[in-house]
Amino acid sequence: MSFRIGHGYDVHKFTSAKQNIIIGGVEIAYHLGLEAHSDGDVLIHALCDAIIGALGLGDIGKHFLDTDNQFKNIDSKFFLAEIKKMLDEKQYSISNIDCTIIAQAPKMLPHIEKMRACLANILEIQISQINIKATTTERLGFIGREEGIATHVVCLLYR
């Protein structure tokens, strides 16, 4: 059996030009949005990078350029579905995924189960294979000042 591990990280800053945020494929009511070329889903972006990294295929930006207008405001679930195809082509399966959302606001806990279900559905895995947790920075740094959100994701693949 062959194992591969990948790590992904993403961060987006808040903007008053949008309302509501999308994290893990779930829309969350908020008075600000996240600035991005796509929908700004920091969790899915980090997850994509983790899987692509584990496959040794670069990063999300290599496959979905942020200068390409076809990806302007696109639903990030599209990226994850495309990366699932890469995973299948390379004949790897997901053992587990562990995600950390770092945000002072809004609160993530009420949305985590919906996020897990959304990601499991796209990746065609069990919800139990995905863990999502959220933390704050105790009001330190740009996240603590509520200027943005960051995520870290680790995934383990096997063949």
Curated annotation (Swiss-Prot):
| Pfam families according to UniProt | YgbB
Give, as one word, the top-level EC class: lyase
The pathway this protein participates in, as annotated, is:
Isoprenoid biosynthesis; isopentenyl diphosphate biosynthesis via DXP pathway; isopentenyl diphosphate from 1-deoxy-D-xylulose 5-phosphate: step 4/6
Going by the entry's taxonomy, the superkingdom of the source organism is recorded as Bacteria
What are the TM regions of this chain, as residue ranges?
none
Question: In this UniProt entry, which residues are annotated as the site Transition state stabilizer?
Answer: H37, T136
Q: Which residues bind 4-CDP-2-C-methyl-D-erythritol 2-phosphate?
A: 10-12, 37-38, 59-61, 64-68, 103-109, 135-138, 142, 145
One annotated GO molecular function is: metal ion binding
Complexes and interactors: Homotrimer.
Q: What does this protein do?
A: Involved in the biosynthesis of isopentenyl diphosphate (IPP) and dimethylallyl diphosphate (DMAPP), two major building blocks of isoprenoid compounds. Catalyzes the conversion of 4-diphosphocytidyl-2-C-methyl-D-erythritol 2-phosphate (CDP-ME2P) to 2-C-methyl-D-erythritol 2,4-cyclodiphosphate (ME-CPP) with a corresponding release of cytidine 5-monophosphate (CMP).
Q: What is this protein called?
A: 2-C-methyl-D-erythritol 2,4-cyclodiphosphate synthase
Q: Top-down, what is the taxonomic lineage of the species of origin?
A: Bacteria, Pseudomonadati, Pseudomonadota, Gammaproteobacteria, Thiotrichales
